[in-house]
């Protein structure tokens, strides 16, 4: 499994994979990431040469917008599965569709899309004449979710804790050790 981006979400994904006994290769744009015994940091070229599954966990930056394009896809040695729970702008949708059509990409799990704005609520109407979007909707090997993959029980608890702490710090009370 190739992981691009090893911040909080990338690390969390890698930890979840430990129970599946898979080799994890990680590309992170920092020179040296902290060794944690979970995966092996590799160059982008080595990741492209070894990964059968590619999972994206990157922020949106000038380096990541359009990162997964036709050139990147063609440089993957193996046919591969693509997971994008990061930013929709990281994957060029037309390149993804072409990769799916020629079986370079075996399937995709997409929690984010290049076309999405702040929410999914209007995406179907806005993209109704977009052939690439229509292809993704109709593909049996594509799973789309409306940018909710990170909404786990753990993330809800963490969000509630952070909000509670901010409210209490603003009003001068503490919630530590209160249940």
Residue spans of the language-model regions?
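Rossmann-like dinucleotide-binding domain for NAD(H)/NADP(H)
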Residues: 79-82, 87-179
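Rossmann-like dinucleotide/phosphate-binding beta-alpha-beta segment
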Residues: 1-78
């Amino acid at each position: 499994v190739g992981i691009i981006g090893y911040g909080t979400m990338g690390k969390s994904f890698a930890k979840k994979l430990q129970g599946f006994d898979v080799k994890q290769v990680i590309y992170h744009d920092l020179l040296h990431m902290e060794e944690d015994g979970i995966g092996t940091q590799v160059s982008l070229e080595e990741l492209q040469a070894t990964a059968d599954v590619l999972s994206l966990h990157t922020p949106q930056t000038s380096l990541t917008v359009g990162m997964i394009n036709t050139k990147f896809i063609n440089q993957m040695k193996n046919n591969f599965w693509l997971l994008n729970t990061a930013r929709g702008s990281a994957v060029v949708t037309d390149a993804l569709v072409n990769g799916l059509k020629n079986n370079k990409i075996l399937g995709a799990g997409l929690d984010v899309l290049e076309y999405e704005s702040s929410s999914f609520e209007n995406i179907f109407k806005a993209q109704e004449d977009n052939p690439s979007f229509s292809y993704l909707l109709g593909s049996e090997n594509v799973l789309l979710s409306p940018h909710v993959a990170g909404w786990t029980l753990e993330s809800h608890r963490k969000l509630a804790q952070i909000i509670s702490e901010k409210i209490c710090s603003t009003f001068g009370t503490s919630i530590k050790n209160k249940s």
